[in-house]
């Protein structure tokens, strides 16, 4: 991390790297992240604050089924020596061999994430300020999966590619006033806020692969194929007005109005 600045501007930049093997075979997790914070007094009447962070994550492999692992016979023959197909437990479990499920599959999940936030504070007049805040979130998450027919006798090979994109925008404008005149104290707020989110999803999958060497690539290699996609959007606008009046502390009056749409 690096930080510094002076009286009118300050900054912080940091990064992190994580790359580790998981406790199960053929699985690991990696993450690379960066973050930057900047605060500045641009003018006597204007302050700025910015926060930006980004991360890339990769998960290789899938989680094991511990119920199957703990109940499978520890001394059984792991797989057929002639075909290379993993055997099922003839005594304790009917499910597929948990070791074979990990060894004969390939799963990769990714996430590319960006978060950004900025606040502008305008000191318009004595007691009167305007805060303008904007935020943006972005996440792209593709994933890929492959399972071999060698997982178990009679198993069908399969593959899938999936991807989702999430975006969110938000803007908040807050005009506030506060002052005291003799025994009278007045404060008022007017807030206007807008937000919108969009999510898209796409997926293709196939089973009965003619050539397992390509793994989760080339859906045309599958005997049976399917695809799907979806789109979701939502938005919200809100307005709030609030007035507070205080006379000599014991007497207090407040009124508020809010509308959403």
Labelled PLM ranges:
Residues 1, 22-29, 33-115, 131-238:
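Surface-exposed loop/interface segments of Gram-negative outer-membrane beta-barrel transport/assembly proteins
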Residues 8-15:
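Transmembrane beta-strand segments of Gram-negative outer membrane beta-barrel proteins
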Residues 3, 121-126, 243:
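Long hydrophobic segments that form regular secondary structure
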Residues 6-7, 43-47, 123-125, 180-182, ...:
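Outer-membrane beta-barrel channels and translocator barrels
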Residues 242-246, 253-256:
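Exposed, low-structure sequence patches enriched in small/polar residues
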Residues 9, 233-238, 245-249:
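Short, flexible loop/turn motifs enriched in small residues
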Residues 15-21, 253-261:
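Transmembrane beta-strand segments that form the barrel wall of outer-membrane beta-barrel proteins
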């Amino acid at each position: 991390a690096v930080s510094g600045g002076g009286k009118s501007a300050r900054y912080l930049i940091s990064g992190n790297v994580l790359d580790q093997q998981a406790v199960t075979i053929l699985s690991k997790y990696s993450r690379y992240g960066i973050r930057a914070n900047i605060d500045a007094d641009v003018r006597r009447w204007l302050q700025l604050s910015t926060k930006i962070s980004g991360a890339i994550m990769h998960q290789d492999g899938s989680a094991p089924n511990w119920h199957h692992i703990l109940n499978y016979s520890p001394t059984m023959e792991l797989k057929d020596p002639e075909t290379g197909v993993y055997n099922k437990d003839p005594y304790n479990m009917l499910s597929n061999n948990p070791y074979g499920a990990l060894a004969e599959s390939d799963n990769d999940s990714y996430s590319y994430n960006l978060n950004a936030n900025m606040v502008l504070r305008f000191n318009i007049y004595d007691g009167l300020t305007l805060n303008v805040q904007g935020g943006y979130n972005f996440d792209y998450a593709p994933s890929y999966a492959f399972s071999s027919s060698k997982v178990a006798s009679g198993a069908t090979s399969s593959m899938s590619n999936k991807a989702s994109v999430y975006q969110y925008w938000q803007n908040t404008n807050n005009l506030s006033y506060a002052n005291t005149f003799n025994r009278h104290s007045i404060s008022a707020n007017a807030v206007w806020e807008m937000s919108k989110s969009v999510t898209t999803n796409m997926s293709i999958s196939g089973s009965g692969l003619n050539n397992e060497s390509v793994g989760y690539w080339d859906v045309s290699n599958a005997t049976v194929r399917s695809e799907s996609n979806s789109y979701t959007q939502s938005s919200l606008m809100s307005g709030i007005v609030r007035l507070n009046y205080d006379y000599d502390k014991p007497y207090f009056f407040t009124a508020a109005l809010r509308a959403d749409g």
